[in-house]
Swiss-Prot record:
The gene is azoR2. This is FMN-dependent NADH:quinone oxidoreductase 2. Keywords: Flavoprotein, FMN, NAD, Oxidoreductase. Its EC number is 1.6.5.-, 1.7.1.17. The lineage of its organism: Bacteria, Pseudomonadati, Pseudomonadota, Alphaproteobacteria, Rhodobacterales. Homodimer. FMN binds at S10, S16, I17, S18. It holds the Pfam family Flavodoxin_2. Its cofactor is FMN. It catalyses: 2 a quinone + NADH + H(+) = 2 a 1,4-benzosemiquinone + NAD(+); N,N-dimethyl-1,4-phenylenediamine + anthranilate + 2 NAD(+) = 2-(4-dimethylaminophenyl)diazenylbenzoate + 2 NADH + 2 H(+).
Length: 204
């Protein structure tokens, strides 16, 4: 049974363009994988903290030497890592803030890049064989040929970090120009329809 882990980052709820793109993708993925399971991880409701000194102390201490406090410091990180390890496929739905990923998504990344678990002690990624789809909603259009294509930092970063942990099969669906929805120049459904063929292909 294929299992899909869905990581959501936008705080905008039903008004979120990235969440609506993700919703469409998940529906297509479920249709293409009848006997499947979907695990939802909404980072806005996770209580995810940024890396702290106690977290780092626990991170660099061998597991067999962990105190109860160290185990507690890594508890949420362990939970997030387990979700990723148990998934066959990963989809990340995210807006773009100031050309990069939201702070919450960066925090999730810091919690799941774990030496000896998702990243080998030799620096090689351990999550080989998994597939990832990154769904991005951005106000600007950063596709090839755009005069601001060099500002496509978010997709470059996410593809890089996924590769670091061993996920090389990464599909990026970039919903550039999403500000048209917020400005009333396009409907949500109309905007997502422009991505339909890419979403369908990515969901297979």
């Amino acid at each position: 049974m294929p299992k899909l882990l869905v990581v959501e980052t936008s705080p905008r709820g039903a008004a979120s363009i990235s969440r609506n793109i993700t919703k469409t993708f998940v529906a297509k993925w479920k249709a293409a994988h009848a006997d499947s399971a979907v695990v939802q991880r909404d980072l806005t409701g996770t209580g995810l903290e940024f890396v702290t000194a106690p977290w780092l102390e626990a991170y660099f201490t061998p597991p067999d030497q962990h105190t109860d406090a160290m185990k507690q410091a890594l508890a949420l990180s362990d939970e997030l890592v387990a979700e990723l390890l148990n998934a066959d496929e990963l989809v990340i739905g995210t807006p773009v803030y100031n050309y990069n990923v939201p702070a919450l998504l960066k925090a999730w990344i810091d919690h799941i890049v774990r030496k000896g678990i998702t990243l080998g002690m030799d620096g090689k990624g351990l999550l080989t064989g998994k597939k990832a789809t990154v769904l991005i909603a951005s106000g600007g259009i950063y596709s090839e040929g755009s005069p601001i294509a060099d500002r496509a930092i978010a997709p470059q970063y996410l593809k890089l970090i996924l590769g670091v942990i061993g996920i090389e099969n990464v599909t990026i669906v970039a919903g550039g120009g999403a500000k048209a929805v917020d400005m009333g120049e396009a409907t949500m459904d109309g905007f997502i329809a422009t991505l339909d063929s890419e979403l369908t292909a990515a969901a297979q």
